[in-house]
Amino acid sequence: MEAHIAATLVPLLGWAVHGSVLTHRLASARRDPLTGLHTRAGWTARAEHCIRRHPSAAVLLVDLDHFKTLNDTHGHAAGDAALIAVADRLRTWCGRNGTAGRLGGDEFVAVVRDMTTADLDALTTALHRPLNYAGMSLPLAASIGACQVAELPVPALSDVLAAADAAMYAAKGRSRRGTHPSH
């Protein structure tokens, strides 16, 4: 009888362990290991949900200015510290109003249910605060492109991202360290 119970339980335990491993791998694939922010895959599902439910939503793309120089001058650990600081600042800024993600490298993304000019100014200020690292004050700067979903005739995430991306490059073209709305 005990052998029969064991024979029944062993495969079930195997499936439970396998399911747990898969769940962990899926969660890891949706979170950036350095910053803890959502990856593109994890962020996209949340962003699509947000823009469907909130017509006043906004999408922002953030690209660090002169990140390669910081990384090359102060080392990869300083670069990682800068990425973590930016992620923390962006996460704090989004708060319960939205979701932040890291697309890769030094590029970040956020979606918020609504955003005012004052909100965008607050983010700009936060992202431009220097980073205290190893007894040094390292300058941080970012170019931010923003798109209000309501500005587009059809609020598809791909179109909102494209508009925010164009706005971000416009901000970079204007000497960096700034924001640019998509309109």
Can you name each region flagged by the protein language model?
Residues D72, R113, G173:
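Short, conserved catalytic or interaction motifs in soluble domains
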Residues A29, E48-A58, V62, T73, ...:
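Nucleotide second-messenger and two-component phosphorelay signaling modules
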Residues D121-T124, C147-H183:
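Catalytic-core segments of nucleotide cyclases and related cyclic-nucleotide turnover enzymes
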Residues W43, A47, A82-L83, A87-L90, ...:
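Heptad-repeat coiled-coil signal-transmission/dimerization helices
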Residues A27-A45, V62-G75, I84:
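Conserved nucleotide-binding and Mg2+-coordinating catalytic segments in signaling enzymes
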Residues A87-A150:
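GGDEF/GGEEF active-site signature
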Residues N71-G79, G104-G105:
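A short glycine-centered flexible hinge/capping loop motif at secondary-structure junctions
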Residues M1-P33, R40-C50, S56:
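Signal-transducing coiled-coil linker helices
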